[in-house]
Amino acid sequence: MMLEARDISFGYGDRRLYDGLSLSFAPDERVALSAPSGFGKSTLCRILAGYEKPWAGQVLVDGSPLPRPGRGAALPVQLILQHPETAVDPRLRMRKTLAQAGEVPERIIEGLGIRETWMTRFPHELSGGELQRFCIARALAAKPKYLVADEISTMLDSVTQAQIWRFLLSECREQGIGLVLVSHSPALTQRVATRVVDLASL
């Protein structure tokens, strides 16, 4: 099941970020998007996951248009953000946040090190690393075909980074999930990615 960005054009106001950009991703790939700061990598992540509508062009999954978030359809592309606090409802306890994706397999909860005591807390009562684990668990529980990970471990300590990436890569391999990632860490990109796309050269 291919993920394809076809002839994407997008910008803000008079500033055009992309003009006829085309990319494709296979389900067995882990693709890093590389470009200078301010180039629009996060914007492209949002477009690939359906959270931003391009001026022109479309995103396809297995040849069909990507469903838009919030329309009741199971989303084949899940977006994980750098700042998890922006991706959760601050009024919900974490157990209800997880439940938004349906039933979360115990292997995901255990693999990400999510503690039972965290389940009854609100987002503001958790650290960034703890909250990010919930966001990743929710994304995986949705049984996506692709994950788009936008700087998901930048704000985390090295131990938490290693644990999260180890589990995430294992799940992607075992469940056949394609991965698109953005990271400013060359070491992480080298360790994780099977292919690097230099957006500035396209």
Where are these regions (language model features)?
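ABC ATPase NBD coupling module
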Residues: S64-Q78, L92, K96
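Hydrophobic anchor residue at the start of the ABC signature
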Residues: I136, V148
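Conserved structural motif at the start of ABC-family nucleotide-binding domains
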Residues: L3, L17-G20
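Conserved catalytic motifs of ABC-family nucleotide-binding domains
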Residues: K143
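Q-loop/switch helix immediately C-terminal to the Walker
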Residues: H83, P90-P105
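Helix-to-loop junction immediately C-terminal to a conserved catalytic motif
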Residues: A49
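Conserved ABC ATPase signature
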Residues: F122-L126, E130
